[in-house]
Amino acid sequence: MVRVHKTYSEVVNTITHTAPHHADEVFATAMLSVLFPVELYRTRDQNIINNTDTIVYDVGGEFDPVRKRFDHHQKGFSEVRPDGIIYASAGLIWREYGMEIVKKLGEAKGVDNEMALEVASYVDNALIRGIDARDNGQGEKGDSMSVSSVISSYNALWDEDEDADSCFVSACNIASIILEREVKIAISSIRGQKLIKEQIEVTKGAVIIMDKFIGGWL
C-alpha cells in the first residue's frame, strides 16, 4: 500500500521529491511497499529532510544507508555497478532491501538467503539497472517505449484535472505489478536451472527426461 500525505507528520515513514515523478523513485516506493505500508511525503524542503529519521530517497543530497538516505544527485556520489551503470534511487533501495523483498515475495516458494541473493541480482540486471541507467542519462535513446517511459506517462497532464499525488500512486501500482512479476520470473528461472542441473547429474546419456515442462530457465 502506498499513501501520499499532503503535509508532513509523525505518520510519514518515507520521503521522496515532489512532482514530476520518475521511474527510479516510483520503483523505490513500490519496493518499500512490499515490506511495509508506505506513508509517503513528497518534498524538497531540506529542513524537513534534515530533521527526519524516515527513509529518504532520490532527494536530500545524501547517500548513507545507516541514516536511511538514498540520494544520487549530489556531488561526489560514486556508487557504480561493475559494468559502469551508475546507481539511482531504485538501485540503491534495491541493493539495501532487495534480498528482504525477494524473501517476502518468494516466501511461498521457500526462498532462502542463497536464492534470494541470486534473485536480487537477476532482477537488478533484468529490470533495475535499466531504470537507473535511463535516470542517469546512460540509457538507450530512441522512440521505443521503456518501463521508465511507461511510469513517466503517469505524470499529471497540464490540461487534465489530475492530482499529481494520485498519479504517483497509480504509477506505483504499475511498478509493483512489474516488480513482483520480475521477481517471480527470476525465482522460476533459478529453480528451473537447479532442477535441470540435478537431472543432468543423475542421467546417463545425452537425453534427459523431465516429468514436467520447465520453461524460462535459459
Which positions does each model-derived feature cover?
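Glycine-rich, Lys/Arg-enriched anion-binding loops that position phosphate/diphosphate groups
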Residues: V123, R134-L218
